[in-house]
């Protein structure tokens, strides 16, 4: 059609030019360029050598340009009629096919958007994969062993947070810990009741960025106020050796005038102190009690129960100390969520600890709290039937503590066999007890191995193992002999298997 119109305009131009400058019929005068072109053109033959003249139109005949215009209009009308006829006689379109196409395209677009979002927000994978020649880093207690369990839970531990949620600083202004999410409070109490490892009735639940922040908050809350500290010595912070290596580092990091690290509790002779009791103990897994009697002096105690869970040790009693610290990193393996909690009896102490977190970080990430609450709920669901469930509707439960204990029993068996095969390493004796949670006798399987190198020419066990591409933490950092090292038992299977093979080959 467009080509036809272009051709018509060309024809019209030629016929208009033939009408002359003032002839009848309303024709337009030819352009000066067209006339000049005809004047300059060479004759095509001897018959056309005479000067070129505009032909005259016959009287009474219809101009040819009008014929061309009429033909063009007729052609357009005919074409339009054919199109209308085709549309009128065609069957109606199937709207459900059209809608399905739109839905498919919309669905595809949504998938692509999600893929782009997932790609742009892909999380880190943590430590790189290892090979038989890799350096195996077991210095940190990175609990990636639990990834295997959580991969099988589907959406049981997933949480979706809309963009408008968790925007306020505040969670519950009526609570002592005003930035604690109510759902995390509920799930913490629920899990402790399910496991039976700590009392929760009559306790304040406080949340922190890991239990380390709450440990610092406890020191702040238990220490004398600034005026009293200025008039005397900072209060001493002690723990029985071997003690957790971060205790002295964290205590003295800011060089506070309120408290200072004073070393082994067994060697302490002062009156004012804060004793840290880690049970099961990091690094050796021993069950600990306070060694200092607060009745004989001005002493307070903080119980670090990060490892008091059924996968590591029998649950022999329901702990009910004044201040108890826990963390999701060792209970469920979610170290990257950075959530810890404290159970605190005294309201005034709870307020001071909350004030420390407020001044330190203005609260704790609500997003992390919501994820931690969902994770803890998934753990409890594995052992506790929900009210809406019946025996018929219950699916096979995914039980974290069963998985954890099975893995730890297997790994400790492998480690003891490797130490025996090498002949130069020794481990603490295995202990056991009746577990109120599993209702059976269970052995202790600590999250860390307290490994000693018995070879006479090795005085630095960490250095010796480093030479064989095994990174551990020296016993010297725990207030103990450098012949000892702490070894994480919580890494992925591939790294742990390589470690076992290397250890068994050392002589």
Swiss-Prot record:
Keyword Glycoprotein: no
One Pfam family here: Alliinase_C
Top EC class for this record: transferase
SUPFAM superfamilies from the UniProt entry: PLP-dependent transferases (SSF53383)
Tissues in which the UniProt entry reports expression: Widely expressed.
Residues the entry annotates as binding pyridoxal 5'-phosphate: 169, 211-212, 282, 304-307, 327-330, 338
Residues that span the membrane, as ranges: none
Gene Ontology MF annotations: carbon-sulfur lyase activity; L-tryptophan:2-oxoglutarate aminotransferase activity; transaminase activity
Traits of the deletion mutant: Strong dwarf phenotype and pleiotropic developmental defects affecting all organs. Reduced endogenous levels of auxin.
InterPro entries for this protein: Alliinase_C, Alliinase_N_sf, Ethylene_sulfur-biosynth, PyrdxlP-dep_Trfase, PyrdxlP-dep_Trfase_major, PyrdxlP-dep_Trfase_small
Cofactor entry: pyridoxal 5'-phosphate
Known pathway: Plant hormone metabolism; auxin biosynthesis
Annotated keywords: Aminotransferase, Auxin biosynthesis, Pyridoxal phosphate, Transferase
EC number: 2.6.1.27
Region annotation (Disordered) ranges: 91-135
Reaction(s) the record says it catalyses: L-tryptophan + 2-oxoglutarate = indole-3-pyruvate + L-glutamate
Residues bearing PTM N6-(pyridoxal phosphate)lysine: 330
Record-level GO BP terms: amino acid metabolic process; auxin biosynthetic process
Function: Probable tryptophan aminotransferase involved in auxin (IAA) biosynthesis. Required for auxin production to initiate multiple change in growth in response to environmental and developmental cues. Functions upstream of YUCCA1 in auxin biosynthesis. Required for polar auxin transport.
Entry similarity comment: Belongs to the alliinase family.
Protein name: Tryptophan aminotransferase-related protein 2
Natural source organism: Oryza sativa subsp. japonica
């Amino acid at each position: 059609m467009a080509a036809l119109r272009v051709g018509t305009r060309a024809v019209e131009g030629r016929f208009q030019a033939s009408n002359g400058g003032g002839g009848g019929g309303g024709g337009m005068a030819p352009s000066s360029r067209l006339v000049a072109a005809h004047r300059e053109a060479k004759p095509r033959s001897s018959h056309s050598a005479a000067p070129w003249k505009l032909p005259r139109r016959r009287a009474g005949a219809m101009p040819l340009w009008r014929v061309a215009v009429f033909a063009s209009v007729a052609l357009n009308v005919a074409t339009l009629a054919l199109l209308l006829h085709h549309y009128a006689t065609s069957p109606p379109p199937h709207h459900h096919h059209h809608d399905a196409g739109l839905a498919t395209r919309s669905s595809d677009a949504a998938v692509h958007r999600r893929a782009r979002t997932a790609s742009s927000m892909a999380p880190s994978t943590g430590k790189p994969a290892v090979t038989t020649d890799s350096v195996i880093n077991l210095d940190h207690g990175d609990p990636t062993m639990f990834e295997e369990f959580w991969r099988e839970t589907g959406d049981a531990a997933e949480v979706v947070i809309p963009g408008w949620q968790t925007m306020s600083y505040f969670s519950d202004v009526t609570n002592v810990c005003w930035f604690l999410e109510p759902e995390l409070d509920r799930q913490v109490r629920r899990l402790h009741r399910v496991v039976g490892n700590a009392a929760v009735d009559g306790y304040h639940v406080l949340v922190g960025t890991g239990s380390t922040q709450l440990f610092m908050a406890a020191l702040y809350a238990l220490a004398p106020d600034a005026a009293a500290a200025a008039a005397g010595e900072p209060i001493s912070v002690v723990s029985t050796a071997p003690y957790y290596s971060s205790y002295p580092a964290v205590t003295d990091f800011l060089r506070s005038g309120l408290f200072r690290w004073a070393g082994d509790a067994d060697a302490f002779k002062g009156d004012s102190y804060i004793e840290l009791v880690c049970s099961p103990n990091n690094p050796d897994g021993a069950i600990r009690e306070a060694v200092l009697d607060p009745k004989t002096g001005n002493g307070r105690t903080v119980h670090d129960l990060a490892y008091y869970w059924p996968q590591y040790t029998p649950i022999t009693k329901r702990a009910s100390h004044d201040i108890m610290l826990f963390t999701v990193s060792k209970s469920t393996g979610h170290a990257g969520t950075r959530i810890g909690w404290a159970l605190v009896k005294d309201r005034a102490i709870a307020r001071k600890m909350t004030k420390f977190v407020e001044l330190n970080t203005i609260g704790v990430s609500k997003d992390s709290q919501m994820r931690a609450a969902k994770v803890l709920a998934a753990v409890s669901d594995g052992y506790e039937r929900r009210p809406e469930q019946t025996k018929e509707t219950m699916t096979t439960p995914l039980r974290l503590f069963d998985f954890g204990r099975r893995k730890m029993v297997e790994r400790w068996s492998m480690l003891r066999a490797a130490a025996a095969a090498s002949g130069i390493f020794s481990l603490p004796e295995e202990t056991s007890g009746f577990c109120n949670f599993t209702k059976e006798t269970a052995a202790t399987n600590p999250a860390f191995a307290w490994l000693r190198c018995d070879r006479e020419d090795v005085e630095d066990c960490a250095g010796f193992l480093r030479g064989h591409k095994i990174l551990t933490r020296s016993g010297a950092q725990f207030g103990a002999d450098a012949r000892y090292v702490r070894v994480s038992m919580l890494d992925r299977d591939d790294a742990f298997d390589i470690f076992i093979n290397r250890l068994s080959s050392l002589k």
